[in-house]
Swiss-Prot record:
Kelch repeats lie at residues 145-190, 326-373, 486-521. Signal peptide: none annotated. Residues 377-519 form the Jacalin-type lectin domain. This is Jacalin-related lectin 38. The gene is JAL38. Keywords: Kelch repeat, Lectin, Repeat. Coiled coil: none annotated. It comes from Arabidopsis thaliana. It comes from the Eukaryota. The lineage of its organism: Eukaryota, Viridiplantae, Streptophyta, Embryophyta, Tracheophyta. SMART domains: FBOX (SM00256), Jacalin (SM00915). One of its GO terms (molecular function) is carbohydrate binding. Residues 2-48 form the F-box domain.
Amino acid sequence: MMQPDHDLPYDLEGEILSHLPIQILARFRCVCKRWNTLFKERRFFNSDLGLARPQFILLAESKICSVDVNLDGPSIEVHNLPSDIPGYKLYMPMHVEYCDGLFLYATCYGIGICNPWLRQIRWFKSSYEGYDFSGMGYDNSRQDKHYKILGSYCTNTTMNASVTELGSDAWKSYEFAFHSWNLSMSPYSVSLNGNLYWVAYNHESRDYFIQSFDFSTVSFKHYCILPTKNGHRQCDGRSLAIFREDRFSFLEQEIYNTRNIEIWVTKETIKNGDGEAVEWVNLMSVLVPEWSSLSVNYYPPSYFVDEDKVGLTLVICCYNKEGKAYIYIAKGDKFHEIEIKDLVEYNPRHRTYFPNLIQVPTFTMSGRSITQHQVESRFAPLRGIQVSVGVGGDEWDDGFFDNVKEIIIHTNSLGIIFVKFYYRNGNVRVAGAAHGDSTETRGLMVPDDDYIEAVQGTYTESHITSMAFRLHKGNRSLRFGFFEGMSFVLGGARGSKIIGFYGRSSDLYLTAFGVHFSPLP
């Protein structure tokens, strides 16, 4: 006789789910209303936050992507993220901050808040002008979190700051005496327990220290001295990060001689208030091999320290001497470096990110809901359509640009085996990565006064057999490949403009193909 089903106690159910990998939990949100509600509770995602290995978020002009590092191998996986930023144009200044599992994007058109893991972005307009976007935190004296944004700029004698609640357009301005320090050594903040922290430099004492900002008291404060070995050398690489969720870690990299890396961590949990009693301990030292392309840059490296039963592993994301994005992994006497080939641009920005299930907060403004033209919610990847046929191979995405400039393709007796595209951003010609393996190619140039409107072709169950590119002015290219299988057409309505490509390539064929497009401006 079958026994009746009994629900597990709510707390026990939550405890079991919190020990599952976050990759699975993200898919479980749609199983039932009960679990979806559970995942939104702060007690749940606070307990789950430390279970996921950190990732890196990279921001280039053409796209935003996340990099997941597999330490067994090692290897990396690159995933494209929503990057439809309202009003964004090429080379427009954009500041990026990270707080409490959420990313902040700030441009002159407004401010966005994003959870890359849940693929959620919300935007609101703001009259945010004249200040550097300095970070997001909250008043930790209140029980509920109300996120606030800090903007600031320095003069010779004062630090001018402006604070607003997330979603509001009312900024309150403050002025602080300037005591021979600045935040120029730290292009981004570190948020912990609602407060903001930066690596700062005192020009009089020539010391590096942590500068803090407390949203509950609206005040800047000298928090604690940093354990630098070469305090007088401003050109060394220095980076502040979170360790074990409640402590600081500090990376220092020598620019001369050995380029050695030292990692320091705070001995105890970081608490709000006075930090003069903070103690630092040296966690690990890394000897960078002479053959490594790792270099010291003005933009500090993003990193995290992984702990397991075997030992400590330092994982760094930064760009190398040539400006190419790399992942560097140091464990014991082994040192690895992996190029992030999905990014074709140089010197991308990067941040460490802890995957989580924290929901992007909704906004209110002056007691009313923000209207549709003030905020947008985006839960989907980049605009694009695709034909996906065969299996196997490596997924790739060139991103999106102003226009497509040149197409390089190679075929054999069965179909398309190689593609490579050149793009244009402003007056800059950008080379996409090569997809496939070939030495013999055919090309198509796109005139400066024209653009690709659609891609037509054929495919079988295993691969793309042919492609032709339709230009807006009515000229169709020669067909590449062999007309065999089912037909496809990729593109938007008449007048839409293709601005990038993505797909999947195996050692033998092009097995999937897609386009990014936008309406004609």
